[in-house]
Amino acid sequence: WNKGVSILHFLGGNSVELSASGTRAISQTKMTITQRGLVDGFECDVVCTGRFYDFMEKREGRWGVVLRQPIYEKDRINPLDPSANFKLDQDLLLSFPEGYRHLAYIQTKLGFKVKEDMPQLKGAAVEGLYQRGRDWLNHA
């Protein structure tokens, strides 16, 4: 809280793909991340939508999440005051991946180090994740 971190994760619809053995699964859950914070003196909300891509396994009769990987699809930033003369540093903004660039922008402005190789809607990172998911299901 002292660094201006006010974040909420909202979970939406879910789909599950089971392995042939019935002991492993890939679960995808729609999610929205909202973060409020100060950016260059303006209070702003960032909204980022995506999915949680979960590797799940049944062990000793109970299901659990083995790995959760977010996939960032798109985001936006809005000043709380719609009349604010609000300008983002375009060089900084465009240095971040498209799927979560506004979320990365506010977090960087708040002093956090942001990973820049996270899976997005398209690209090598998400294709690699999907392949890992197929391998997970096929080697159950």
Predicted regions and their residues:
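Beta-strand elements of well-folded, non-transmembrane domains
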Residues: 31-37, 56-58
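A solvent-exposed, acidic/Ser-Thr-rich amphipathic alpha-helical stretch
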Residues: 1-33
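Hydrophobic/aromatic beta-strand elements that line small-molecule binding cavities or substrate pockets
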Residues: 11-16, 51-57, 70-71
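Acidic surface patches and DE-rich sequence motifs
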Residues: 19, 39, 59
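General beta-strand recognition
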Residues: 24-26, 57, 62-64
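Terminal "cap-and-tail" regions of soluble proteins that handle hydrophobic small molecules
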Residues: 40, 62-140
